[in-house]
Amino acid sequence: MNSEVKIAMKKIALADLLSLEAYEAQRPVIRQAIMDHKKTRRVPLGPNATLHFEDYMVMRYQIMELIRAEKITADEELEGELEAYNPLIPDGKNLKVTFMLEYPDEAERKERLRQLTGIEELISIRIAGYDPVYPIANED
């Protein structure tokens, strides 16, 4: 397969963010939509590991939740958040994935995370007909 598909995802701009008041009013609907959307972007790897594929919609939601929690209104602070979150949106030449390891029991979590140090070097994604792709971990 030699054909390349390039789909550049839009980056989040200040104009894409809602005011605190508007977000609060729309939050229940937005939250339900994002929960439904995120279900289609998760790949479980076992009982304790999941891949979450990031995109514009997910990152915009995360920024809006941060703005809500921290009551951020100044454009300068908002721009700082955009600078932090926009690199987590795929640019059409890559995937952005959060690898979640979840262990509810604190003692087990500490032990497992110690044992799993470096696991990001052992993971790859392979699509039929293509070579495996290995992550660039902690790029952000």
Where are these regions (language model features)?
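Short amphipathic alpha-helical segments
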Residues: 26, 55-58, 108
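Generic amphipathic alpha-helical segments used as scaffolds and interaction surfaces in large
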Residues: 14, 21, 50, 100-103
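Short, extreme N-terminal leader segments that mark the start of a protein/domain
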Residues: 1-36
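A glycine-rich, hydrophobic loop/mini-helix early in the fold
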Residues: 48, 53-96
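Catalytic core of tubulin tyrosine ligase-like
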Residues: 39-41, 45
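Long, charge-patterned amphipathic alpha-helical coiled-coil/hairpin "stalk" segments used as oligomerization
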Residues: 83-92, 96-140
